[in-house]
Design a protein with these regions (language model features):
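The feature marks the first
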Residues: 1-58
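Intrinsic, low-complexity N-terminal interaction/targeting segments
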Residues: 1-26, 66-128
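Residues in flexible loops and secondary-structure boundaries
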Residues: 20-22, 35, 46, 96, ...
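Short, structured motif recognition centered on aromatic/hydrophobic residues
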Residues: 23-28, 48, 52, 97-99, ...
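Short, well-structured hydrophobic secondary-structure segments
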Residues: 35-89
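Mixed-charge, glycine-accented linear interaction segment located at domain edges/termini
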Residues: 106-167, 171
């Protein structure tokens, strides 16, 4: 697979396809005519937003303009792979947040993710996408991600599990 390194992408966003309860989550990076779409999990989008939010709070205050780019996914939505590990760092001299999205590499025999503490020298390394984001882009991502995560199925008031439009088997009401 091909890896990408973008030092100043136009857009870094998240989005979904499908109705609540059946949504598929994606991360997307756009730079000029290049569109990179990666499939991910809802929890990864939420965790990335939480981490970004904390990182922005921890940084020295710096004036930055809010991102004004369109944060909707650009079609066609064709993921190049599914994201596995995600790394985030702060580049102080350039005042950039560096995000590394690594491809989820599955073990060929069992279809399960390889254990990171048991490297296989014969295993093929997965691809990655490395982006350097401005504070404005990160702030825009946080707002977009929170909107997406909260727009899912409402939680059951008794057990907290998601409730489908047709209801759900609540273990606390059984």
């Amino acid at each position: 697979m091909t890896s990408f390194e973008l030092s100043s992408p136009d857009v870094f966003t998240a989005g979904t396809v499908g109705p609540p309860g059946q949504r598929v989550f994606y991360l997307q990076v756009r730079d000029d005519n290049l569109v990179i779409t990666i499939r991910c999990e809802k929890q990864q989008v939420a965790a990335l937003a939480d981490y970004f939010d904390g990182l922005l709070d921890d940084l020295e205050p710096s004036p930055y303009e809010l991102a004004t780019a369109d944060l909707e996914l650009t079609e066609p939505i064709v993921p190049i792979w599914t994201v596995g590990p995600i790394g985030v760092a702060y580049d102080d001299p350039d005042d950039k947040i560096v995000v590394v999205l690594e491809e989820l590499v599955l073990d060929d025999e069992e279809g399960e993710a390889d254990e990171p503490d048991e490297p296989d020298p014969e295993a093929e390394a997965g691809a990655s996408v490395k982006v350097r984001l401005s504070r404005a882009q990160v702030s825009g991502f946080v707002g977009r991600a929170r909107e997406l995560v909260s727009s899912g199925r409402p939680p059951c008031r008794f057990c907290g599990l998601p409730v489908d439009p047709s209801g759900h088997p609540c273990p606390r009401m059984n």
